Amino acid sequence: MTNIRKTHPLMKILNNAFIDLPTPSNISSWWNFGSLLGLCLIMQILTGLFLAMHYTPDTSTAFSSVAHICRDVNYGWFIRYLHANGASMFFICLYAHIGRGLYYGSYMFQETWNIGVLLLLTVMATAFVGYVLPWGQMSFWGATVITNLLSAIPYIGTTLVEWIWGGFSVDKATLTRFFAFHFILPFIIMALATVHLLFLHETGSNNPTGIPSNMDMIPFHPYYTIKDILGALLLILTLLALTLFTPDLLGDPDNYTPANPLSTPAHIKPEWYFLFAYAILRSIPNKLGGVLALLLSILILIFIPMLQTSKQRSMMFRPFSQLLFWTLIADLLTLTWIGGQPVEHPYIIVGQLASILYFLLILVLMPAVGLIENKLLKW
């Protein structure tokens, strides 16, 4: 009798995705982040569900309801901090996953890559609307500043902003709709992630060499299931350490002050995972220009497959491209640091130079070096 996992209509899908899936024998720990992102998503949905049972999306009670969760609900403080720091872990995994894709040329699977970019945008939108919900000072002013950027759109900008706000400022209507978005988006992310996986399994995984590995595959289970479990344990350990020892390390103290439309915080800044984009936005002294640069800083990922000039897929055997890749990482870390600094000398000029370098590396230097490496290999 054939095993039920190979015949049952539902089990067959799971079997082909997680058990009998042929996988390259040489994929490194950088390939762990996909499963870790799945784990993060499940954790966020579960903790978020329990938080939503006690949260009230109303300007007069939102802040108090979060305080109530932390003080009065059984393990409410734990669920709340798991959810907040879980978002940080989510973005760490997300950026590592994208970095892996850039380094090893995984972006050559175009459908998978494009859905991945769409997933990134959806996760960023979810994190943004979620940050507004506690209704602290940074929640309110972050929402005001970021939604206001849409007013830079010619002709329809102002109307669009007021439509999103549901009034003439960020108020009760805004909070209610942001809660609705924050609740629905993770399920959209889940659906997109399934499609992401579907397209990946059409081609099979890439591997560190970038060379087709059809002749050297091993079953996903037990080899990569055990490897994924190790990654998951390390992720959970890190998340628990962060949550139980320094739960507010990555948060903003301003968000412990209830939202006050009459008092602007000295430094309005987003959570750490958006700082690089925020620095790019601020580095252009023009509203529309800044908004376009902000959008392009993320959407540039869509154009990466078109900018591939090297005849080798992976950077594994391309030392000059590796140098530029790590320069890009250093540049992004610089932008992240600048995004958290006040707008004054020398931070302004450093941010502008880092922003120029970011686009220069991706659009000009990396494709040029790819061509040079081809020449060096007489290809």
Swiss-Prot record:
What Pfam families would the database entry show?
Cytochrom_B_C, Cytochrome_B
| Binding residues for a ubiquinone | H201
Q: Which residues form the signal peptide?
A: none
| Annotated GO MF terms | metal ion binding; ubiquinol-cytochrome-c reductase activity
Question: What are the cysteine partners in each disulfide bond?
Answer: none
GO CC: one term? respiratory chain complex III
Question: Per the entry, which co-factors are needed?
Answer: heme b
Q: Which UniProt keywords apply?
A: Electron transport, Heme, Iron, Membrane, Metal-binding, Mitochondrion, Mitochondrion inner membrane, Respiratory chain, Transmembrane, Transmembrane helix, Transport, Ubiquinone
CC cofactor note: Binds 2 heme b groups non-covalently.
Task: Say which domain of life the source belongs to.
Answer: Eukaryota
Q: What CDD domains does the annotation carry?
A: cytochrome_b_C, Cytochrome_b_N
TM ranges are 33-53, 77-98, 113-133, 178-198, 226-246, 288-308, 320-340, 347-367
Q: State how it assembles.
A: The cytochrome bc1 complex contains 11 subunits: 3 respiratory subunits (MT-CYB, CYC1 and UQCRFS1), 2 core proteins (UQCRC1 and UQCRC2) and 6 low-molecular weight proteins (UQCRH/QCR6, UQCRB/QCR7, UQCRQ/QCR8, UQCR10/QCR9, UQCR11/QCR10 and a cleavage product of UQCRFS1). This cytochrome bc1 complex then forms a dimer.
An additional note in the Swiss-Prot or TrEMBL entry is: Heme 1 (or BL or b562) is low-potential and absorbs at about 562 nm, and heme 2 (or BH or b566) is high-potential and absorbs at about 566 nm.
The entry's protein name is Cytochrome b
